[in-house]
Amino acid sequence: MLNIAYCSDKYQYTMGKSFYDSGMKDKRAVFNLFYRKAPENNNWAVVSGVDEVIEMVENLGNMDPEFFEKFLPGEEYKEFRGYLSAMKFTGNIYAMREGEIVFPNQPIIIVEGPLIEAQVLETPMLCIMNHQMAVATKASRVCRATNRPVSEFGSRRAHGPWAAVYGAKAAIIAGCASTSNILTGTLSGYGSTGTMAHSYVTSFGCSVAGEYEAFDTYIKTHKGESLIMLIDTYDTLRCGILNAIKAFRNNGIDNSYEGGYGVRLDSGDLAYLSAECRRLLDEHGLTNCKIFATNSLDEYLITDLERQGACIDCYGVGDAIATSKANPCFGNVYKLVEIDGQAVLKRSEDKIKLINPGFQITYRIMVNDPSKGEIFKVDVTCLRGDELSRKIEAGEAFTVCDEYDRYKFKTFEAGEYQAFTLQKKVIENGVNIAPKYTLAEKKAFCHDALMHFSPSERRLINPHYYKVDISDDLYNLKMSIITRLVKEINHFSTNK
């Protein structure tokens, strides 16, 4: 069985050796996991993967010294290997809840603990979070393209079994109505769903009669269950839909059937074919028969089908979700922001890679708008315990300024807002204290959070930007470190 805690890069451990030998192993470090830019011109992403991160952290240290000798050989590593074998994570971890909506540069996960313990979590944590957040964010986009149910059907296209199982979980959190993956359904208690393959139809003989026999047999062997006939194996309109109607009627499947029944289209002009199938089904009194559509769908194709008035009741989406096809690599990073109480940052040659230093906390501010109801108005990331953080915690009036335009600001008066802390402690002194949520609860939480943003902020194309700021104290700390660094660099470069 793989121990995912050691799905890591070797340099995490060679750096750890330096920390260990130089007496730095117990320095208190704070790392932030965050992303800089949302994919596909989104303003935000959907959090998924936190539960697997916690599980991974709990498995740290469950390996014999012989395991470490395989990649850290030699007598000079012997003492360090013994340390690693016994090393468990003893610090604290704060994380956003799965299903939360997160914006660029906000800490999704904050790791606070001894330096080596915190450092070696980087690679496996990013592996988990980048995969699941890519899938969840894409699934949210696909689901927002329609008000009709979207099922996740992408396991066969996923990048391995692990990706299929946890990708399906992420897709459901972000809005998918169901998944075809039975392992995800079994582990989560959420259940799974499915239809039939073309091979099922052709196994009864490559003929029109064989197609009817396939449908008839399936109905007879699955009475009381969902009955979805795949009707495009040979010809959708000239035999497929007609055989499905005949099989339904001959087996007494009509609008009184409680198990749910329908047909699936997997090729061709889905808008035209769905309209024709709807007409034929209705003519035969099967008005409750659902029409499912698959065939390399994504949010853009679904949006276009909806625009054309396609008679589709449910969509099945595979690789577009399972691989986050248009943006398969999510951009979470894991950066040191504080060491032994001293804030640090990475300045970099690229402005986008400049990070926020210090031990942080993010608040989401909600107001009751007379015309829109309860809506989120601004997110602000503060240094823990700074002036703005204290005001928000006390419910006092406060003002937030735009980080890049200090003339843009907004004041919230006492009593007119509610504040929600986005990062909650999930591991305390190495002990898992995270609350347990079902997959259905995570999905409901994500939907509820999304509905508190305005429609313009949720749209797929050119969404309106939601206000995301940092506190004055955090801004000033960042600027002071940068100013000091620039002076040091200038002095160093001119006096070398």
Could you tell me what each predicted segment is?
Residues 30-32, 90, 150, 333, ...:
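A residue-level signal for beta-strand positions that form part of recognition/binding surfaces
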Residues 49-52, 76, 134, 438-442:
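Short amphipathic alpha-helical segments
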Residues 68-69, 137-141, 154, 458-465:
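Short coil/turn segments at secondary-structure boundaries
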Residues 22, 28-85:
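N-terminal, Lys/Arg-enriched amphipathic/low-complexity engagement segments
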Residues 193, 263, 291, 313-315:
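Hydrophobic residues within beta-strands of alpha/beta enzymes
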Residues 1-28, 37-39, 75, 81-284, ...:
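Buried, small/hydrophobic-residue-enriched core segments of structured protein domains
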Residues 1-27, 40-42, 284, 297-496:
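Gly/Ser/Thr/Ala-enriched C-terminal appendages of enzymes
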